[in-house]
């Protein structure tokens, strides 16, 4: 009985060792064929990323080496600082123009300030040039309006002239047509009466009379 049990146990151990060996071989094949290639490609990708971002590393290192020189450090070293140029123009208090009555200088008759006005290349002040430009603009506008008024007046006169001439021509034509008519009207007898009017009435033929004309025959 003991020998049978020993052989049975030996067989079971052998079977278990074989299963373990097969499992180990499977794991080895899985690691070498599937896992190691992926790890290799991952390492290569990481190396490429590191090489590509190396310039960032150098940039940050160089920026860390920058030394900012302050005014106190320069003064302690005995150097004289030059005045810094400002981006904004400086405004003098004398030329400030605020909306107050006291700070405006006296104005002359032409409306130009007599003092404190900036001058131009021609010698006049800027405000004076501005007022002169405004005056010239107003003069040009006035002259243009005056020209338009004159044109309207001339056109109105021409229109009236042609209307009056047409009316006089029509009246003259009416008179000519009336005088050229073959039938002449005789004015009625006035209350006082004149010899000329009676003579004209006597010369007129009465209705129903026959008028004979002398005709010469060859």
Curated annotation (Swiss-Prot):
GO cellular component: cytoplasm; DASH complex; microtubule; mitotic spindle; mitotic spindle pole body
Locations listed in the record: Nucleus; Cytoplasm, Cytoskeleton, Spindle; Chromosome, Centromere, Kinetochore
Pfam families hit by this protein: DASH_Ask1 (PF08655)
Comp. bias regions, Polar residues: 109-131, 172-181
Coiled-coil ranges from the UniProt annotation: none
Regions of compositional bias (Low complexity) in chain numbering: 182-193
Segments for region (Disordered): 109-218
Keywords tagged on the record: Cell cycle, Cell division, Centromere, Chromosome, Chromosome partition, Cytoplasm, Cytoskeleton, Kinetochore, Microtubule, Mitosis, Nucleus
GO biological process: cell division; mitotic sister chromatid biorientation; protein transport along microtubule to mitotic spindle pole body
Stored InterPro entries: DASH_Ask1
PANTHER family attached to this UniProt entry: DASH COMPLEX SUBUNIT ASK1
Quaternary structure annotation from Swiss-Prot or TrEMBL: Component of the DASH complex consisting of ASK1, DAD1, DAD2, DAD3, DAD4, DAM1, DUO1, HSK3, SPC19 and SPC34, with a stoichiometry of one copy of each subunit per complex. Multiple DASH complexes oligomerize to form a ring that encircles spindle microtubules and organizes the rod-like NDC80 complexes of the outer kinetochore. DASH complex oligomerization strengthens microtubule attachments. On cytoplasmic microtubules, DASH complexes appear to form patches instead of rings.
Protein family membership: Belongs to the DASH complex ASK1 family.
Known role: Component of the DASH complex that connects microtubules with kinetochores and couples microtubule depolymerisation to chromosome movement; it is involved in retrieving kinetochores to the spindle poles before their re-orientation on the spindle in early mitosis and allows microtubule depolymerization to pull chromosomes apart and resist detachment during anaphase.
Annotated protein name in UniProt: DASH complex subunit ASK1
Organism name: Kluyveromyces lactis (strain ATCC 8585 / CBS 2359 / DSM 70799 / NBRC 1267 / NRRL Y-1140 / WM37)
């Amino acid at each position: 009985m003991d020998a049978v049990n020993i052989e049975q146990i030996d067989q079971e151990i052998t079977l278990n060792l074989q299963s373990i060996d097969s499992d180990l071989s499977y794991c080895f094949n899985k690691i070498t064929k599937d896992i190691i290639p992926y790890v290799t490609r991952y390492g290569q990708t990481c190396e490429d990323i590191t090489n590509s971002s190396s310039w960032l590393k150098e940039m940050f290192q160089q920026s860390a080496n920058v030394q900012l020189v302050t005014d106190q450090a320069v003064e302690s070293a005995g150097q004289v600082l030059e005045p810094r140029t400002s981006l904004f123009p400086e405004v003098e208090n004398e030329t400030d123009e605020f909306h107050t009555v006291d700070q405006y200088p006296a104005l002359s008759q032409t409306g130009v300030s007599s003092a404190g006005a900036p001058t131009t290349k021609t010698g006049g002040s800027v405000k004076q040039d501005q007022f002169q430009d405004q005056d010239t603009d107003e003069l040009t506008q006035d002259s243009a309006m005056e020209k338009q008024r004159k044109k309207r007046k001339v056109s109105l006169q021409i229109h009236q002239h042609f209307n009056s001439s047409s009316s006089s021509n029509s009246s003259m034509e009416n008179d000519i047509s009336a005088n050229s008519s073959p039938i002449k009207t005789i004015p009625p007898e006035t209350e006082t009466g004149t010899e000329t009017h009676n003579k004209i009435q006597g010369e007129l033929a009465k209705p129903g009379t026959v008028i004979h004309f002398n005709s010469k025959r060859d």
